[in-house]
Amino acid sequence: MRVAEVVRNTSETQIRVKLDLDGTGQQKLATGVPFLDHMLDQIARHGLVDLEVEAHGDTHIDDHHTVEDVGITLGQAVAKAIGDRKGIRRYGHSYVPLDEALSRVVIDFSGRPGLEFHVPFTRARIGTFDVDLSIEFFRGFVNHAGVTLHIDNLRGINAHHQLETVFKAFGRALRAAVELDERAAGQIPSTKGSL
């Protein structure tokens, strides 16, 4: 079973993430940031990842530390659940539409952190959620999961739709990349023999 639990405690946040990469999309989310919970739900449902996230942060200041640290902890949990990366497909991509919005996400479990984030948001906030925090979430994830991640919103007018398509596509790309390939069982998906 590819299950992991990670706890991260700092002076700014206390976070627990538990996940099962071979789940059915069940989720239990309580980050204290409602829009983040909504986006994490998209990852769980579209990635078929069972996901529990509990976070307590200094949201009286703003949501930055909580959102970033949830991304960090999720990245650590994914890396822990995958282990040595033997037998995974390694690459995943997805295009997801939502009404007028369309996003593409491509992921590579390369062991080399890298983020290309190109989302021309049409407004700065979705409700009370600062859209810039989505970059911090994905940067935290990338740096601690050891992945290269390309995120492109190809079109969109509604900022909520833009970001929701990003998170849905991320969940689907993640699902594809961590899927076990029977033909490559026990093999590292790299000509170098390591990731």
Curated annotation (Swiss-Prot):
Domain of life: Bacteria
Cellular component terms (Gene Ontology): cytoplasm
One Pfam family it belongs to: IGPD
GO biological process: L-histidine biosynthetic process
GO MF terms, alphabetically ordered: imidazoleglycerol-phosphate dehydratase activity
UniProt xrefs under InterPro entries: IGPD_sf, ImidazoleglycerolP_deHydtase, ImidazoleglycerP_deHydtase_CS, Ribosomal_Su5_D2-typ_SF
Subcellular location: Cytoplasm
Entry keyword annotation includes Transferase: no
Protein's UniProt keywords contain tRNA-binding: no
Catalytic activity: D-erythro-1-(imidazol-4-yl)glycerol 3-phosphate = 3-(imidazol-4-yl)-2-oxopropyl phosphate + H2O
PANTHER family per the UniProt record, alphabetical: IMIDAZOLEGLYCEROL-PHOSPHATE DEHYDRATASE (PTHR23133:SF2), IMIDAZOLEGLYCEROL-PHOSPHATE DEHYDRATASE HIS7 (PTHR23133)
Name recorded for this polypeptide: Imidazoleglycerol-phosphate dehydratase
Annotated source species: Burkholderia orbicola (strain MC0-3)
